[in-house]
Every structure is written in C-alpha cells, then in structure tokens.
A protein has these predicted regions:
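Feature 926 captures the class I aminoacyl-tRNA synthetase adenylation module centered on the KMSKS loop
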Residues: 213, 442-520, 524-526, 532-534, ...
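N-terminal, positively charged nucleic-acid-binding surface of large information/translation enzymes
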Residues: 2-256, 325-338, 342-357, 381-421, ...
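Structured, non-catalytic alpha/beta "coupling" segments that mediate domain-domain communication
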Residues: 85, 237-289, 383-414, 640-666, ...
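Phosphate/diphosphate-binding loops
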Residues: 367-392, 817-820
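Catalytic alpha/beta core of large soluble enzyme barrels
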Residues: 238-240, 244-348, 377, 418, ...
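Metal-dependent nuclease catalytic cores in nucleic-acid-processing enzymes
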Residues: 68-85, 330-341, 373-376, 556-572, ...
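Conserved short loop/turn motifs at secondary-structure junctions
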Residues: 12, 62, 89-90, 121-125, ...
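Amphipathic alpha-helical
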Residues: 24, 172-200, 204, 270-271, ...
Length: 970
C-alpha cells in the first residue's frame, strides 16, 4: 500500500479570511505567542514600545495601519533570534475620557461635573476607558498583532502614577518644574490650558474670522488716530497698549477725511487716495498715549500708551502698529510685564465677558465679534472690516475654538534643555528621514516650556503641596511620603484630602487642585510601566531606550515628543532609536474618512471579507511611510489578485504535482549548494538569495515598502518565469528520482519554504498555512524537530552557494532579448505558437542551456549570433518565412492549447487520461495527423479519433482560419 501524500491538497481558492480564522484557533490552542517568547527568552533584547491607545473609542482602519507596522518588526527581530517583549498598555487619563463621560451623563462643563460629584465622575471615567477594550483586543488579535494584553500597563494604576510623581520630583529638585503666569492656549469649554503639542494637533485650515482695522485716537492731537489691525475683535475690550517698531518709518496721512498714522511700508492697505502730511520714526511715537476704545473695566495703573516692540511688529501684514491685549497674547503679556503696563481680564474662564463689561457681559467672545465691530463703527473707531481665511487652533478633543488666555499654570522648563533635545533627536533614525530635521526638528527649534497643569479632574494629580500661610512648597515623589501606598487610589478627590505639615511655619499644606497633561503620562511609559525606580531597575535599564516605535505622523508633537522630552530631562538620552511615522488614511478618492461622507472602512468587516494579511500587505507595499494611504476594498483586493493569488497558485501547483509524484523533500536534501543543478534552477536559487539579501537589508533600516516590493518581484519571477519554464519537467512521466525532475522539485520546494519564512512577519497567517503544509505538519508527516509554526523558525539567510550575481544578470539579459524577439513577432503579426526557422542575436552568445530557453520562448528552431558592441544595445532579428512544415506545427500547437482548456473546463485531474475527438479538414487535419504523437503527449490523450462524438466538453471555431471542432471524453 502506497504511503499517503506528504502534502495536503490545496484548494484553488486562497480564501484568506477563512484560513486566518483557522490559524488563529490553532495559535490559541497551542499557546503559540507565549511559546515564541519562551523560545527567544535568552536572546539579545530588542525593545519595542507600544504607544498606548485610549480604549473609550472603537478602533478604526488608521489603527490597523499603525498596528500592522508595530507587529512587523518585532516578528522579524524575533525570527532573527532576539528576545522581543511586547507589553500592551492603555492611555486612560485626560480630556478625551472626561468628555466621553460628560456626553454619557448629558452634562457639560466643570460646574455640572462638580455638582454631580468628582468622585462619582472619576469612577465613571475609570469605567469608560475600559468600555471598548474587548473591541480593541479583538481587532488586535484578528490582525495578528502579537501583544501581551493579559498584563498591560494602565496610566491610572497607582504604581504608574507613583513613577510619574517620582519623575516630577526629580524635575522639581533641578528647578525644572515651576509655576508661572503666562498666556497659554486655553479651551473655554473644558476650562483648562493646553500644551503647545496639544495646540498643534487641533489646527483647522481655512477658518473664516473677522479682519478689522481700528482707529486709536491719540491724546493731545487733533483727531489723529493710530491705525491697528486684528483678527480677534473680542480682544479689543482688553486692549492696554499698542506697539510699534522703533526704527521703522511711520507716516501721518489724510485719507477719506481722516488723519491716520501707520507704517510707510503698509500704505497699501489704505482705501482710496491718501496724502502724506508728516513722517516720523517709530521711536518718536513711543510713550504717546491714546484714548481707550472702551471705558468699561478700565485697568488700574499704566495703560493706553505706545510701546516699543520690534519683536512684535511685522511689515508683512497689518499696519505696522500692533494692538496689544496683555491677557490674550503671549508676546503681549511679556511686553506689558516688561514695560510695567497693567494686565487685566475682561473675559472669564468660561470664555464669556465678565459682569463689569456692561455691553457684552455673558456673551461668548466669538459670538461678541459682530457686535463689537458694529459698536466700533457706530463710534467712528472702525476704519474698515472684512474677513480673513487662515489656520486657527481648536481644542484637540472638544473642537471648541481656543483662546489665548493669561493664567497661572505649572510648567516644565523644557527650553533649558533645548539643545540637548535637538542633539538627541538627531541621533534617531526616522522613517521618513525628513521628519528628523523637518517636522520634529522644526518643532524643537521653536520649543517653549511645557504647560503641564490642567484644571481638570481625571488625571495624574500634580504632586505639589503649598502652605497658604507662608507659601512654602513641597513636591512629593512617592506615595509613601503621604503615608499611602501605590495600591491606594491616588486620584482626585481622595488625594485632595491629604494634608501635610508645613516644616517652615507649622501650617497645613494642601495640594494644588490641578492634574497633569495626559501626554506626560504617555511619555512616562518607558519607566512607569515598570514602576521604576521603586522596583524593576534592571529591567528598565535593559528596556530603555526602545529600538523601535511607530505611530501616526501627528505624534511628532504628541507621544514622540513627550517620550523624547521626558527621557532627555530624566535620563539624558533619547527614548527611542528608530521611528516609523505613518501618514493619513484616506478613501480611494483622497478624502478624509467621516460618517458624513459614508466612506469609513470597518476593520472587522474588511478582515472578514478580504483577510487581515491582504490588508497588512497593502499598507506595507502601497506607499512609503509618511505618505498618505488611499484605502478601499478594491485596492486591497488588488493586492490579492496581484500578489497573493500569484503566490498561492505557485504553491498549489507544487503541491498538486508533489502529491502525484510522491515527492518527499527530506529524501532529496533540498537547499544547500546549487551545485550541478540545471542553470534555470541555479538562477532561481540565485534570485532567491538576492531577494533574501535585499529584504533583510530593507528591514534592517525599517523600509517595509522596499522589502515587500522585492518579495513581489521575486514571486512574479518564480511564477511567471521559473515555474512556467519548468512545467514540462514536472509534467513528464519520469519518476521523481529522475535527476532533472528531482532538481525542479527541490528548487521549487526550497523557494516556497523560504518564502513562507520570508513573508511571515508581513503575512503571519498565510505564511503559517504554507509552512505547516510544506513542513508536513498538516498531514502528520513532519520530520522530528521541525517547528510546528513558521513563527518558531529562523528568518531566512541566503546560502553562499546560492549566490550567483553573474547568472542573475545573464538571465535578465536573456529575458530582455526574449522581449525584443516577441516585439519582432508582434510587428510581423506572428503569434508565438507559430514556429519560426531562426532567430539571430546581435550580441554575445548565450550558454547552451540559456540558448535553449531563448529558442523555446521565441519558438524558433535555431539561434545564430552576430557580434555586437555591448549588452545595452543588443537586439534580435527573426526569419519570418513560414514553410509548410512550420505552418502545420503551428496549427497543432493551437489545437493543443484548446484541448488543455477543455481539460480544465471538465475539471479533470492532472493525470487523468482522455480520448480526443477532432473534426477538421485540409491542412488542420493534416497537422493533427502529422504531429499525432506529440499532440497526444501534450494533452494526455490515449487516442485521437476523427469525427464528432458524445463528450464531456467541446469547442468549435477556427484555427489558422480553418473550421474545427474538438471534444474530450474519458
């Protein structure tokens, strides 16, 4: 009794989605992820940081993009023998969580939160961040992203918070954490200031705002006004000064019955004719006073005068005179504090005008703009008004227009280490490379101190206690200093009940009410996930910095920055060595995805229909990181058609014939040196070696796009050149021990087995299916010690005996010559099935084996050569004279093709024999009779009968212009 086949039968349909579900089940049942970690436990560490998502929202297709890259490189490095820990984590604090809970409670704003109760509110926040954990874990698992989600870090854990407190205490001790009164981006809806990196994430383009030119009447001058410009009319009630450039030239003009002063360079903004009546330097205006625009809430102290501020004045826009509202502009506040000018607020923390501002009290500032403009016009203070289209910041979470608002906040003095931050950034390898000195570098060059404090509730409490009696201040660096442990709830409001004894005066110290920026939380994950320095000091040292991180491009001013800043401030080194920044995910027409447009792609549905592997491969191969991705089911299907099916059909071809012939790779020692194999086989192994080398080189520099495209080219060569050129070697009836047939099997097996390992980091499911069948695990015929998963194998390395660059080049030359010859056939109107007598190569001779391939590809009987200069200008000419014998041979080749089409339609097995029935006359019948034996061998016919009969499948038409009927039966 014959042994069962070594290889399981392969379905003609790849059916990625169904196959992936089966692979997932096997991974779970065999605990494969844990086993893979255990296998490499003693390897050299490779450190990957998972940027923590917030699980109070469902994962989207853009998360699939980043998680595809996050999985690729840890898998690759693991197969190279590295120990790759992959700890998951959750970002649990901050405004995004609070806003979600507010919506669920149908409340809005801090007053209603406090009425509801901070303790209850924060408990709901804690529950909210776990709302979609199941969906996130399901997506992560279905994608094939191996991540340890059983023991994740959470930024709300007491151990995590305690590590963050430790870091802030270190900054405090070095005078890098301070309290300051500054103008900062401020959200009136959330009633908290924001950091500059949060600000950068909320800019909206083409925002329409008012553009107004306002007249400030000089005192002591007869109806002369300083002309200033602003796009924020709501700040005009808070005006306390105007600024000029002391060295610029200013002019007094008569224009439309008005006397105005502005910079000479800005005269172009005037409407109508004007006449210059006087000229002066900006310095001559400094110290002059003017009448306030509004008399409500007048400031106490010095105000309403012209200040010298060259750093504030631009001659590119406006009038050269700058309206200054100290409480609503960062540079404005610095100028006024320097000059001793009064600082006053006319707007409350809710973004509405204060009670004392009679005309506008209770009105939200942006809503007050039209009324302010109308009042200015009515009082003769408006020169002209219009609109401006510009970029403006909105709250990155609630989408409210931000205000620049002066208030007391706590800051990290990041500017003190600006140069070190820049140096550390330059040591990082960025993908794309331009991010280092571009987006990230520019951000660091314009660095400001980090606005750390938030006037909110659900976050890491700022660990600073202040004595109200003597203003003594203390920063706490551990829970133990408070008589607590990391297992206690360290959040508001519980932590607010903790009081300390003031060592200076004996008073009672109370904690400042603020929490910290949640981006500081996420940037703390390298050390806080390990509860460093309270434990795991050695573990942290081994896992810092990271070898690799990946997130979307906008994280240059989010997580990438917070990681770099904290690591530099605390450890004087970058937090990571290699970064991949992914671009935006757009629809197929290049539009952003939104519910309104109905173009959102659901990851779960995409995986169910097309498979995770195809989605992953699309993201790796479509564009280089940093570019925007156009995504649609059709584009992902193209990956299946273009690459997956080509590979699958090659794999299926091998398995079908290997099952027929009983091929067993262990008995024929695949791999190793190419030795004395046929030249085509040696070329295949040489191309495989080249592919391996190029893929490893690309992955070593984090270039997934180059790696995938290299693999695609090899698979195309394997299918459309090697397998097509080798088909007859598999078809022939010789036993598998025949040296030529065995070499073909060995070569194709080696290529496919290697490809399974080569694509494993990219397409973990498909690679697993190929590996398990090719290794014999699917049929229970695997050799002892053979890994039962491709993810427990080593990543391919090219064997030295495979490399043959000269042969690779020569085969490429051969294929160029074939293309040239086929072009000649096309010009002559001669199909390739029509044999020709001779082809002449104008260039150096091919080797005998390659010449045979060349002749067969062009279907010529002989090849001759004419000496030529160089390979680049080689060419092929054909003898296009068709003799009677050549014509008959061409006719029978066309018959053979039609019959093999009928075999496929009849769903016959590869080795099924048939009866061939032919109805034809003239030259066509003569061709069949002349080449009868050849035709029978080509179509596996036991006999050929002339005339019609009952058949399984039939075809009728013309061949070579002559009527013909063909039928096949068993």
């Amino acid at each position: 009794m014959a042994d069962p086949p070594r290889f399981a039968a392969v379905d003609g349909r790849a059916d990625l989605a169904e196959g992936e579900r089966a692979v997932l089940d096997r991974w779970k049942s065999t605990d494969l992820f844990r086993r893979s970690l255990e296998l490499r436990r003693d390897g050299r560490p490779y450190v990957f940081y998972e940027g923590p998502p917030t699980a109070n929202g469902k994962p989207g297709i853009h998360h699939v993009l980043t998680r595809s890259f996050k999985d690729l490189f840890p898998r690759y490095m693991s197969m190279r023998g590295y120990a790759v820990a992959r700890k998951g984590g959750w970002d649990t604090h901050g405004l995004p969580v609070e806003l979600e809970v507010e919506k669920s409670l149908k409340i809005s704003g801090k007053r209603q939160i406090e009425e509801f109760g901070v303790a209850r509110f924060n408990e709901l926040c804690r529950q909210s961040v776990e709302r979609y954990i199941d969906e996130w874990e399901a997506m992560t698992e279905r994608l094939g992203f191996w991540l340890d989600m059983k023991d994740p870090y959470r930024t709300y854990d007491g151990t995590y918070i305690e590590s963050v407190w430790w870091s802030l205490k270190r900054l405090w001790d070095r005078d890098l954490l301070y309290q300051g009164y500054k103008v900062a981006p401020y959200c009136p809806r959330c009633q908290t200031s924001l950091s500059s990196h949060e600000l950068s994430q909320g800019y909206q383009d083409d925002v329409v705002d008012p553009s107004v030119f306002v007249k400030f009447r000089l005192t002591g001058a007869e109806d002369v006004s300083l002309l200033a410009w602003t796009t924020t009319p709501w700040t005009l009630p808070g005006n306390v000064a105007v600024a000029v450039h002391p060295d610029a030239t200013y002019v007094e003009v008569e224009n439309r019955g008005q006397r105005l002063i502005l910079a000479r360079e800005r005269l172009g903004i005037l409407d109508g004719e004007h006449r210059i009546t006087a000229e002066m330097r900006g310095g001559d205006l400094v110290g002059r006073t003017y009448e306030p625009l509004f008399t409500d809430l007048l400031p106490e102290g010095k105000a309403f005068l012209v200040l010298s501020a060259p750093e504030l004045v631009s001659m590119e826009e406006g009038t050269g005179i700058v309206h200054t509202a100290a409480a609503y502009g960062e540079a404005d506040l610095e100028l006024c504090l320097r000059e001793g000018v009064a600082v006053r607020h006319v707007v409350g923390l809710d973004g509405r005008f204060l009670e004392g501002q009679a005309r506008y009290r209770g009105i939200f500032v942006k809503d007050a703009d039209p009324q302010i403009i109308a009042d200015l016009e009515a009082e003769g203070r408006l020169y002209k008004a219009g609109q401006v289209h510009h970029s403006y910041p909105f709250c990155w979470r609630c989408d409210t227009p931000l205000l620049y608002y002066a208030l007391t906040s706590w800051f990290i003095r990041t500017t003190a280490l600006k140069e070190r931050l820049i140096e550390n950034n330059r040591s990082v390898d960025w993908q794309p490379a331009h991010v280092r000195d571009g987006r990230m570098g520019n951000w660091l060059e314009n660095l400001v101190d980090w606005n750390l404090s938030r006037s909110r509730y659900w976050g890491t409490p700022l660990p600073i206690w202040i004595c109200p009696e003597c203003d003594d201040r203390r920063c706490v660096g551990s829970a133990a200093e408070l008589g607590l442990t990391a297992q206690d709830d360290l959040h508001k409001p519980h932590i607010d009940d903790v009081v300390l004894l003031c060592e200076r005066c004996g008073g009672t110290m109370r904690r400042v009410p603020d929490v910290i920026d949640c981006w500081y939380d996420s940037g703390a994950m390298p050390y806080a996930q390990h509860h460093y320095p309270f434990e795991n000091q050695d573990l942290f040292t081994r896992r810092h910095p990271a070898d690799f991180i990946c997130e979307a491009m906008d994280q240059t001013r989010g997580w990438f920055f917070s990681l770099l800043a904290e690591s530099t401030l605390l450890f004087d080194k970058p937090a990571y060595r290699n970064v991949i920044c992914t671009g935006l995910v757009l629809d197929k027409d290049g539009r952003k995805m939104s519910k309104r447009l109905g173009n959102i792609i659901d990851p779960a549905q995409t995986f169910a229909e097309l498979g995770a592997d195809a989605t992953r491969w699309y993201f790796y191969s479509a564009v280089a990181p940093g570019s925007d991705y156009r995504v649609s089911p059709e584009l992902i299907r193209d990956v299946v058609r273009r690459f997956v099916l080509t590979l699958w059909n090659t794999y299926k071809f091998f398995c079908e014939y290997a099952r027929l012939d009983g091929y067993i790779p262990e008995q024929t020692a695949p791999g190793g040196s190419a030795g004395d194999r046929p030249e085509l086989d040696r070329w295949c192994l040489a191309r495989l070696a080249q592919c391996i080398d190029e893929v490893r080189t690309a992955l070593d520099v984090y270039d997934a796009t180059a790696a995938t495209r290299t693999i695609e080219l090899f698979v195309e060569d394997l299918s459309k050149w090697y397998v097509r050129r080798s088909r007859r070697r598999f078809w022939k009836s010789a036993d598998v021990t025949d040296s030529d047939k065995r070499s073909a099997y060995d070569t194709l097996y080696t290529a496919l087995e290697t490809l399974a390992r080569l694509i494993a980091p990219f397409m973990p499911f498909l690679a697993e299916r190929l590996h398990r069948n090719l290794s014999g695990h699917e049929t229970g015929a695997a050799a002892p010690g053979t890994p039962d998963s491709v993810h427990l194998t080593d990543y391919p390395e090219a064997m030295a005996g495979w490399r043959d660059p000269a042969l690779v080049d020569e085969m490429a030359r051969l294929r160029r010559l074939v293309e040239d010859g086929l072009g000649g056939r096309e010009v002559a109107g001669l199909g390739v099935r029509q044999p020709l007598r001779e082809a002449t190569v104008h260039g150096r001779p091919l080797s005998p084996e390659l010449e045979a391939i060349f002749a067969d590809e062009l279907n010529v009987k002989a090849v001759t050569y004419v000496a030529h200069g160089d390979d680049e200008h080689e060419g092929v000419t054909l003898d296009t004279v068709i003799t009677d014998d050549l014509r008959l041979e061409g006719l029978v080749r066309n018959v053979s093709r039609k019959v093999n089409d009928l075999r496929k339609q009849a769903d016959l097995a590869l080795d099924d024999r048939i009866h061939l029935h032919v109805e034809a006359d003239g030259d066509l019948r003569r061709a069949v009779e002349t080449h009868r034996e050849h035709l029978m061998a080509e179509v596996l016919a036991t006999e050929i009968g002339f005339g019609r009969a009952d058949v399984l499948r039939e075809w009728s038409g013309k061949i070579g212009g002559e009527p013909c009927w063909l039928g096949v039966s068993r």
